[in-house]
Amino acid sequence: EHGYLLDKYTGCKVWCVINNESCNGECNKRRGGYYGYCYFWKLACYCQGARKSELWNYKTNKCKS
């Protein structure tokens, strides 16, 4: 699956500014994906190849912050 990484504590997307390295590390090492980057226009980490449960979904996840 592809999409924005989910912060399971807050229900929000994992935020970033311009740091592809941190998003890629989060995607690869912690979420089982193969490539992650900071999507600049949304200021959120986008991950390719992660499990669906690791990704933010507009319909099912509510941001608490």
From Swiss-Prot:
One function term, GO molecular function aspect: sodium channel inhibitor activity
Annotated source species: Androctonus mauritanicus mauritanicus
Protein name according to UniProt: Beta-toxin Am IT
Main subcellular localisation: secreted
Example of a GO cellular component annotation carried by this entry: extracellular region
GO biological process, one term: defense response
Tissue specificity note: Expressed by the venom gland.
Pfam families, A to Z: Toxin_3
Similarity comment: Belongs to the long (4 C-C) scorpion toxin superfamily. Sodium channel inhibitor family.
Remaining remarks: Negative results: does not inhibit the binding of iodinated Css2 (AC P08900) and iodinated Ts1 (AC P15226) to their specific antibodies.
Entry domain remark: Has the structural arrangement of an alpha-helix connected to antiparallel beta-sheets by disulfide bonds (CS-alpha/beta).
Taxonomic lineage of the native organism: Eukaryota, Metazoa, Ecdysozoa, Arthropoda, Chelicerata
Modified-residue entries (Serine amide), positions: 65
Residues recorded as bearing Pyrrolidone carboxylic acid (Glu) in the entry: 1
Subcellular location: Secreted
